[in-house]
UniProtKB/Swiss-Prot annotation:
It catalyses: phytanoyl-CoA + 2-oxoglutarate + O2 = 2-hydroxyphytanoyl-CoA + succinate + CO2; 3-methylhexadecanoyl-CoA + 2-oxoglutarate + O2 = 2-hydroxy-3-methylhexadecanoyl-CoA + succinate + CO2; hexadecanoyl-CoA + 2-oxoglutarate + O2 = 2-hydroxyhexadecanoyl-CoA + succinate + CO2; octanoyl-CoA + 2-oxoglutarate + O2 = 2-hydroxyoctanoyl-CoA + succinate + CO2. InterPro entries: PhyH (IPR047128), Phytyl_CoA_dOase-like (IPR008775). This is Phytanoyl-CoA dioxygenase, peroxisomal. The gene is Phyh. GO terms for biological process: 2-oxobutyrate catabolic process; 2-oxoglutarate metabolic process; fatty acid alpha-oxidation; isoprenoid metabolic process; methyl-branched fatty acid metabolic process. The modification N6-succinyllysine is found at K59, K108, K231, K252. It comes from Mus musculus (Mouse).
Length: 338
């Protein structure tokens, strides 16, 4: 599908929107676990009943807002994702709709088609090879524990965190992913984030604030960092700096599933290599879109719409909800609302 076809699809979508619409499992605990005898199923708020998660795993996610599944994605799949990423960076393939991003510290350098010039690609829903990640049965098996059976792939990314050149721009500020989405309820949304290599504090692993998914969506904006901030890297403006933090050390193929209200970020990449991970946000198609006007999400909504209008050549006809529905893809079950 080329951009012309994408534009045509968007026009059809906008018209539609104008009408009413009906492996080994290891969880690393960071807080005490309730015993099965003292924890009743009706207390579950963030996980759904099925035979995939153990009681201990459900309790862990309920308490902490994330769950690490070891060795979930195969080496073969990860190598295929890496190879496709490199082809995209070399401009050997140009999937329609894909967004290629560069670190702000590299933005002034002359661009040469190479994976060393790209910090992230996103919106790869039209790239058959990368989108396979969002269709992997081993991923969807766990996603369904949080979203239910009707599953939409909302947003795919492959992150290529570059070595930090001293400006600390490879950091990702602490944030909540729900800031970027107009979908509710938040409990039916989950991110799957898979390490494509060994990841630790040296190359900028994820850091999470356990239990913060139980709070509310906080105001976000660009942090005032001296070295600059990457495009759309909004951060929380008000959080408790004394909150306990957990750094997720992960091996290739390990996958963390986390709630969209969980506060998380990542540190600098202090190595000479590029730290790679692939992720997708999933949501239940039973979710509803909300109007973010007058909320703390207005700032990101403006940015997203401006980028989409520039990309597709539509001025004044799109809103925040349209941009997300346009990119979302059904991966399991039935498409209901979004």
């Amino acid at each position: 599908m080329n951009l012309t076809r994408a534009g045509a699809r968007l026009q059809v979508l906008l018209g539609h929107l104008g009408r009413p619409s009906a492996p080994t499992i290891v969880a690393q605990p960071v807080s005490g676990l309730a015993s099965p005898a003292s924890f009743q199923p009706e207390q579950f708020q963030y996980t759904l009943d099925n035979n995939v998660l153990t009681l201990e795993q459900r309790k862990f996610y309920e308490e902490n807002g994330f769950l690490v599944i070891k060795n979930l994605v195969s080496d073969d799949d990860i190598q295929r994702f890496r190879a496709e990423f490199e082809r995209i960076c070399r401009e050997e393939v140009k999937p329609p709709g894909i967004v290629i991003m560069r670190d702000v510290a590299l933005a002034k350098q002359d661009y040469m088609p190479s994976d060393r010039m790209v910090s992230k690609i996103q919106d790869f829903q039209e790239d058959e090879e990368l989108f396979r990640y969002c269709l992997l049965p081993e991923i969807l098996k766990y996603v369904e524990c949080f979203t239910g059976p009707n599953i939409m792939a909302l947003h795919g990314m492959l992150i290529n965190k570059p070595p930090d050149v001293g400006k600390k721009t490879s950091r990702h500020p602490l944030h909540q992913d729900l800031h970027y989405f107009p979908f509710r309820p938040s409990n039916l949304i989950v991110c799957a984030w898979t390490a494509m290599e060994h990841i630790d504090r040296n190359n900028g692993c994820l850091v999470v604030l356990p239990g913060t998914h139980k709070g509310t969506l906080k105001p976000h904006d660009y942090p005032k960092w001296e070295g600059g901030v990457n495009k759309m890297y909004h951060g929380i403006q008000d959080y408790d700096p004394n909150s306990p933090r957990v750094h997720l050390v992960m091996e290739k193929g390990d996958t963390v599933f986390f709630h969209p209200l969980l506060i998380h970020g990542s540190g600098r990449n202090k190595t000479q290599g590029f730290r790679k991970a692939i992720s997708c946000h999933f949501g239940s198609s039973d979710c509803q879109c909300i109007d973010v006007s007058g909320t703390s999400q207005e700032n990101i909504a403006r940015e997203v719409v401006e980028m989409a209008e520039k990309k597709y050549g539509f001025q004044g006809v799109m809103d925040f909800k349209d941009t997300w529905i346009f990119r979302s893809r059904l991966v399991k079950g039935e498409r209901i609302n979004i």
